[in-house]
Amino acid sequence: MKVASFIANRIAFNRQRSFSRFIIRLSIVATVISVAVMIVTLAFTNGFQETVSQKVFSFWGHIRVQYKQPMKSSIAEEEQIEKNDTITQAIRQKAVVVSIHPFATKYAILRTKEEMEGVLMKGLDSSYNFDHLKQFMKQGRWLRFSDTTYSREIIISSYTAGELKLKLNDKVVIYFIKPDGSLRPDKLAIVGIYKTGIEDYDKTFAIGDLKLIQRLNGWKPNQIGGYEIFIKDYHDMQKISDDLYYNIENFPSTWDTRTIKDLYPNIFDWLSMQDVTRDVLIGFMIVVAIINLITCLIILVLERIRMVGVLKALGARNWTVQRIFLQHSTIITCVGIILGTAFGIGICWLQQSTGFIKLKEEAYYMSEAAVKIVWWQVALVCSGTLLISFLVLMIPSFIVRRVRPVKAIQFR
């Protein structure tokens, strides 16, 4: 074993009581807290962003194909387009596409004897994969469709049910606004109640049969409001949207492709802001860990100043003496990183298992904090903390170079 490593290990694992021993423990605790907070911050931010994003995508898909209306609001009714089997088949053949479904929306008013509530009815057909919405269903079942007529069933949000004092299997009168401005009443049975936790959705949407909307609008069976497309990786949304628009042969010039990020920018801009908070907190934790380690190293050098003088008097080079304290500090850092990683992952596991951290769903779109551990991020936190600490600790270690052996040996 090299001299520097031997002495560093003897100092590090020396059980003799001293002031530096207290400082070492304090530095380890600070490193543990810093590493744990960084891991927890990353895991909670990842979980939060993914959970909210997946809720948005599950309700609306990742990409919409509809009539080209650049200034159209995300909750406005669509202009009709005609189904095009050639285009939809070309989209389905894309390896990145999971499914494609027709839809249309129409404003309506739900009314009971005491209350009324405006909704935007989202019409779907029997080809729709209910698995996308299954996670949101709190009560009831999916719509049952008929081959000959439209379904007289509706799914409403728990918010709407609460406002109108409705429950599962109740009949509700619904008024649709026809193209000529007149109201057309109908009576539908509530077969399901959903809750996404996203206020914009829960206060706005009800789900019904696409055929009903076609009939109300006077559309033909092959006329729809658009298509919603689900893809494998939401990170590729924009690229896939552009690919569909520009590269599919005979793509209608009156059609447009828009990502859900384009339609709901406020939600995704808010999610992006979490990255700033995450980065600031991680940066602060790194600074805290480094300051504690620098303080610890300076105290270690000052406490062992006579040892430094003796080693230099015996002919030890400055770099050899520096390495003793650098390796000692590295041992302290490694202990802190290992314990901090275990502590941070433990908190994440506990949250996944028990959900002990609760959130206000109206504000955060979820009732408890979501966690997603990305292991390469954990590895980056550990290796980055170790590397940055080592490089920064090089600076105070240069104190050793200024020590004069004669004065250091006389130091008490």
Where is each model-derived feature located?
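Peri-membrane helix termini and adjoining interfacial loops of integral membrane proteins
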Residues: 1-9, 130-131, 258-260, 350-364
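Peri-transmembrane interface segments
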Residues: 14-25, 233-291, 300-302
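Hydrophobic alpha-helical transmembrane segments of multi-pass inner-membrane transport and secretion
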Residues: 20-46, 272-307, 330-339, 387-391
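Membrane-interface junction motifs in transport/secretion proteins
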Residues: 49-83
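A structural signal for hydrophobic secondary-structure junctions
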Residues: 80-221
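Transmembrane alpha-helical interface segments in multi-pass membrane proteins
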Residues: 298, 305-351
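Short helix-loop junctions at transmembrane helix boundaries
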Residues: 338-381, 394-398, 402
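Short cytosolic juxtamembrane segments of multi-pass membrane proteins
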Residues: 398-412
